[in-house]
Amino acid sequence: MAASPHTISSRLLTGSVGGCIWYLERRAIQGLPHRVTRLFRNVSNQWVTLQHLSFLKRMYVTQLHRGLSQRVKPKPEPPASPFLEHTSSGQARADEDELPSFPAPSRPLSRKPNEELVELEATSIVDHSLDTAKEKKEERQWKEMKLHTDDLPGILARLSKIKLTALVVSTTSAGFALAPGPFDWSCFLLTSLGTGLASCAANSINQFFEVPFDSNMNRTKNRPLVRGQISPLLAVSFATCCAVPGVALLTWGVNPLTGALGVFNIFLYTCCYTPLKRVSITNTWVGAVVGAIPPVMGWTAATGSLDAGALLLGGILYSWQFPHFNALSWGLREDYSRGGYCMMSVTHPALCRRVALRHCLALIALSTAAPVLDITTWVFPVISLPINLYISYLGFRFYVDADRRSSRKLFFCSLWHLPLLLLLMLTCKQRPGQEGDKGEAPS
């Protein structure tokens, strides 16, 4: 039976299509080696990556030969989309020529799940990123600090807390000037110099002991010992070179009583106050005693005795430090807590505010006691009452509000309150021959 023309044309078309498909498959099989490039990644010692240039498919095979030890450091390039990346046949051949040829593995492809393979690759990338970050951190951490001779005076000034030392010397000078008797300039200079050296020594030893804790606080993390600008040996040597001549000047240049007070204050600050800061809130009261001794030293340097006037000056400095320091520590509670210090503002905030207010009011009573002890005239408690009432008002606001704003106001008020109060005391100082006329202002 003869086939119809339609059947003959269908068979011819089917044969032509089949021949074309066979020809294309043969060309694809012959060109496959030119489209495959072996790319090695530092994923594992037992895996090799094969990347198909047409579809960017990654396959993993088991490494059989120990000679395949080539490692290429991965470059931090963002991965390109497989649907947007097109590689020409010429570039493929060039990449194939650059890479060495390796024998094909004899074992079949691994049949591990794709999730495990992706996890291996991701783990290698994360490990490499962590290693790079660790190297950069170590480079910053172990950066060499060079000490120049020109920078040494400034470093030693920060080591000795030069501003705090200046405050100590000024209160000592006020105690010397308020003491009865003639003003001896040579004794005054020796007292100021000896007290300043003793203060530098105490502050340097304090920083030496607190290096591990200061590094955790934003307020103290840039101190010289914390940053490694000077060695601990140099800091201790500087403290010794300040303490020995300072105590010698106070003992033999002034009088033994003043020298003994200087030694006691260094011991109290370095061996009692410094370790107590991490143990108990009583460190604040001990620190207030340390700050109250310098005006007493100035009084004993001028008179050679420890009488009621010296104790009154010490009491004024003692009470002034509580609103000053409690207001300061209130704004640094996070820092003190991070550094491991036991402060009233951290552990007993209500007591911190109550003590500050209590000693603000005590300044009024101590100012009233000054003319009773023949240190000043009766004009002093009158003219000092406004500033004492003002700091008491700020202390009350700090007690009621218990916020950072009120503590800052109280702290900045204390900065100008003390020098103004001492200046008023010097202005109203009791002169010889005025004991019977205490109500008149000095001429």
From Swiss-Prot:
Recorded superkingdom: Eukaryota
Class of this enzyme: transferase
Region Disordered, annotated ranges: 68-113
GO cellular component: cytochrome complex; cytosol; mitochondrial matrix; mitochondrial membrane; mitochondrion; nucleolus
TM stretches of this protein: 174-194, 230-250, 252-272, 286-306, 308-328, 363-383, 410-430
EC number in record: 2.5.1.141
One function term, GO molecular function aspect: protoheme IX farnesyltransferase activity
Keywords, ordered alphabetically: Heme biosynthesis, Lipid metabolism, Membrane, Mitochondrion, Transferase, Transit peptide, Transmembrane, Transmembrane helix
GO terms under biological process: aerobic respiration; copper ion homeostasis; cytochrome complex assembly; heme A biosynthetic process; heme O biosynthetic process; leukocyte differentiation; lipid metabolic process; mitochondrial fission
Reactions accelerated catalytically: heme b + (2E,6E)-farnesyl diphosphate + H2O = Fe(II)-heme o + diphosphate
The keyword Transmembrane helix is annotated on this UniProt entry: yes
CDD domains xref list: PT_UbiA_Cox10
Compartments where located: Mitochondrion membrane
Membrane topology: Multi-pass membrane protein
InterPro entries, per database record: Protohaem_IX_farnesylTrfase, Protohaem_IX_farnesylTrfase_mt, UbiA_prenyltransferase, UbiA_prenylTrfase_CS, UbiA_sf
Pfam family, one: UbiA
NCBIfam families in the record: cyoE_ctaB
Role this protein plays: Converts protoheme IX and farnesyl diphosphate to heme O.
Family: Belongs to the UbiA prenyltransferase family.
Protein name: Protoheme IX farnesyltransferase, mitochondrial
Organism: Mus musculus
Species lineage: Eukaryota, Metazoa, Chordata, Craniata, Vertebrata
